[in-house]
Amino acid sequence: MRSKQVLLLITLILLSPCAWAQQVPPVTGAEGVVVDVRTGEPIAFAQVVFVGSQIGTMVDAEGRFQVENRQGLVTLSVGFVGYKKRIVTLHANRITKNMRIELEPDVYNLSEVVVTASRHRDRYSRKNNPAVDLVNEVIAHKEQQRPQHDTSQLTYEKTILALDRFDFDFERNALLEKFSFLQKYVDTAQFNQTPVLTVSLRETLSEGDQELARQSTGLDNLLEKEGLSANLDAMFTRIDIFDNTIDLMLNRFVSPLSSTLAVSYYHFYIEDTVAIDGERCVKLMFVPVNRESFGFTGHLYITVDRHVLKRYSISVPPQINMNFVSDLSLDETFSVAQGGCLQSKEMHTYARFYIFKNWRQLYAHHGVFALDGGSGEEASGVSLLDDLRPVPLTAKETVIDSLVTELRRVPEFNAAIKAVEIVGSGYIATASDRERSLFDIGPIYNMVSLNPVEGVRLRLGGMTTANLSSHWFTQGYLAFGTRDLRLKYSATAIYSFRPKEYHPYESLRHALYLSTSYDLENPGQNTDLLDRDNILMSRWPSLPPTAMQYARRVGLRYEHEWQNRLSVDAWVQYADFEPAGALAYHRIGADGSLTAVSRFADWQAGLQLRYAPGEPLYNNRLGQESPFNLSKDAPVFRLRHTLGRTDYRFTYHRTDIIAEKRFWLSSFGHIDTRLHTGVVWNRAPLPSLFTPQSNLSLYLSPNTFTLMRPMEFVADQWVALHATYYLKGWILNRIPLVNKLKLREVVSFSGIYGSLSPKNNPRFGHEGLYALADGTTLFSTTPYIEVGFGIENILRCIRIDYVRRLTYTSGLGKRDLGGIRIGFRLTI
């Protein structure tokens, strides 16, 4: 399945009547231990599954297990390699505790290999193990087997989303009665043969990397303009089992065929021989050494004669630290292509998602099929899909549009859609149906905020939509501070050379922007994710004011974005600045005297090149940096050059180079990094120099310094590094009891080193330069460094860090040396 930073999952579940008026079914389950009947020793990694379903678990290293369901299932199947499978019947509608399930050893011959029940974790040996030898044989030749990329291969992909176990009694529940029409749309899930309500269908036909046709129907189309497609594609990617690391559901898993980790990360067991497409294959079972690690359980089917991977079937252990995913399994079958390499015949991914475990879940099935023959030139669009679709649509899949039409007639459904649109986009449509809204009000997150200069800041704004014009747009706002009593404003006219579906920031962008504004800002503050006046970036008005300034701007900007993820920005701008808060400017005279500067002007012309190879297109109004954008693995490079003239006397050139990259450490988490270096080439006064981005609010904002005051440092040459390591629970998952909280560790580092050359150093008394402002200092030979240690995934979305400043600490109070910061991050 694919999804919109789980926002789609929340939407689909909330939109279903089960989220409003569901009577939670009783629980049937069991807790206990699985042991060897002869020795009484626990059997680690045994599988405990409810018969007729995918609901189950893997027992831990001590043989303990806990499993439950709300679907009325009462029969458990318990098994492990080398043991006879045992069927156990439970008492319905209760949890059976302290169970002791004894498995009887089994002995059977497989070719020349004898498999017995002595496969406990403490007895497992990699030496003289035929299963390990067989895996090593496949790994050694995997480059010869790996499927090759074929630019002419036609591939069909199909994704369905459905509300799982949709078996409500509509007649007996008054709240559900108005949704009784849903019964005629109920289908059967291929995953577990349960009743489901299919709410989304997506089909794609590709030739190599070129997409030939795409078709989608269902509820998610109502949210398409907020970036849904990119997130759907990010969650469901085509995996390669031969890679060392598998990218799945926005996480990284160690492959059972990893050249570096497979044998040490997994235990392998030969289980049986089976026939697949007429070939005898060894059925090889594998389980992770540590059940909390990001790995798989499952089977590899390897041909007996050629030791070629014929098929694999893998699933994710329920103990790992993943959010919102209750079941996840994959199955892929291969054929041998010309040249001896493998070719994928078809691959299936099945998943079930949840918001709250006691609610109905979201079922997803993603299928990828290799097509024989045909050509993308024979037809186009939907007709091409109809001609080449390998599996016919079910009767219920063909009427999803009718389902949506009927749902739109229910007021409660429309209200839920409206609420999700507001949360996802930050804007409120001025019509009941966004397809008729000419103007949207927002962003809602900026309507009220706090800061020491303005006090309570009130803001109201919005933008026109493509329903008014698909090329011409306007946006703006008015803001007012209860303390400074100044009216601020912003107005932008946009012409898009490409027609837009709803708003001007949809990819690909090609537009002109003419803007004017007057507002309060922090020098050096240019946060990536949030505006300065976002409610989360507020500072309590009673705190001492920091360095701020009023800025009046008029500018013209041109933006062009290409499919290869190269974009260019060019702009000219006039700005007039007035110091505010704790900021004051003083100009140095010929005799060394200081003259107060109440305001100054700055002209700029600039050009920026941005390149992000592999970055998916994203259509949210916040752009690629939106917190709702799930896919941020692609590297981003920016080269920016600015020509400016400040105070009508200083002409300067400034160059910035910025690189951002996410480094995955296989299943051990990832490190997000950002490197920013630059130089001001000419003499320039203080306001035109570089000052690091600071953020003194309680909220964690990426790529900012949380304990540095605005304009605390200035430089004309600098290099800054931000790095955050998300460990994904690698440590906490191994601590008993703590691991049940699903907490995850975070370690962060922010550092910067810079210098101010003599030509721009006011201490040398150069006429016309500005003296250093109060509280502003220069870098010594020591870089500025702050580090943070935190816990995330609290309640699935909250992050709490303790941040500590390590350098330039002289004279600072305890509060300025460190503190608690809070962030929000919703991940799978």
Residue ranges and their predicted role:
Residues 250-255, 381-828:
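Exposed, low-structure sequence patches enriched in small/polar residues
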